[in-house]
């Protein structure tokens, strides 16, 4: 698979040869869906909680006698049928949202995503991406010259200047190959990878 090479001015150079094992796989929509859903589920923190009828603070006194009032039977005001009563199936912080995906499936899913992005021409390669100073303006000018507005930058080592400059840009993220997740790969319109990072990705996913 040939990936397009960009220079600092956004002009295309000679293509970069990449491994077909990582960048030349068939598109597997079901596998990609499974990997992305598992990633989103595992990112959930489980920080919501509701009370059941044992936890709400109510008296246990019977609201009215069982018979003779003409009203429906009622045992206590903490009943889920009553306003202010407990929930029948309350959400709990102890809920486990995690999904398990085997390592081979996870790697195959990432390879399928990279391959489809390469076929769509959404992956570009640069020799390196560094900044002289941690200035957002400098990075914004570079991306504008390359025609990039929504971009995930994958670099072999995250330069401090590059990281600081990218934090204030919307729709821009900078990660190392080992932290490239399936959701980010799909979310961003373009993927910009350094040459050294391409080799690292191939090593991680081969």
From Swiss-Prot:
The keyword RNA-binding applies. Signal peptide: none annotated. Keywords: Ribonucleoprotein, Ribosomal protein, RNA-binding, rRNA-binding. The keyword Ribonucleoprotein applies. InterPro entries: Ribosomal_uL4, Ribosomal_uL4-like, Ribosomal_uL4_dom_sf. Residues 58-70 have a biased composition (Basic residues). Part of the 50S ribosomal subunit. Residues 44-78 are annotated as: Disordered. GO terms for biological process: translation. One of its GO terms (cellular component) is ribosome. One of the primary rRNA binding proteins, this protein initially binds near the 5'-end of the 23S rRNA. It is important during the early stages of 50S assembly. It makes multiple contacts with different domains of the 23S rRNA in the assembled 50S subunit and ribosome. Forms part of the polypeptide exit tunnel. Belongs to the universal ribosomal protein uL4 family. NCBIfam families: rplD_bact. This is Large ribosomal subunit protein uL4. PANTHER family: 50S RIBOSOMAL PROTEIN L4, LARGE RIBOSOMAL SUBUNIT PROTEIN UL4M. GO terms for molecular function: rRNA binding; structural constituent of ribosome.
């Amino acid at each position: 698979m040939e990936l397009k090479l960009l220079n600092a001015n956004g002009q295309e150079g000679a293509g970069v040869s990449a491994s077909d094992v990582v960048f030349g796989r068939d598109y597997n929509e079901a596998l990609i869906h499974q990997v992305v859903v598992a990633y989103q589920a595992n990112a959930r923190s489980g920080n919501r909680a509701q009370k059941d009828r044992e936890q709400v603070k109510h008296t246990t006194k019977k609201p009215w006698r069982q018979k003779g009032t003409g009203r429906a039977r009622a045992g206590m005001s903490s009943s889920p049928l009553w306003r202010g009563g407990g929930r029948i199936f309350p959400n709990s912080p102890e809920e486990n949202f995690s999904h398990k995906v085997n390592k081979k499936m996870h790697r195959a899913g990432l390879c399928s995503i990279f391959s489809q992005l390469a076929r769509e021409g959404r992956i570009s390669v640069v020799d390196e991406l560094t900044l002289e100073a941690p200035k957002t303006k400098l990075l914004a000018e570079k991306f504008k010259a390359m025609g990039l507005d929504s971009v995930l930058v994958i670099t072999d080592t995250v330069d401090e200047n590059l990281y600081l400059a990218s934090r204030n840009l919307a729709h821009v993220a900078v990660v190392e190959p080992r932290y490239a997740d399936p959701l980010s790969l799909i979310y961003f319109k373009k993927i910009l990878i350094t040459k050294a990072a391409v080799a690292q990705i191939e090593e991680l996913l081969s």
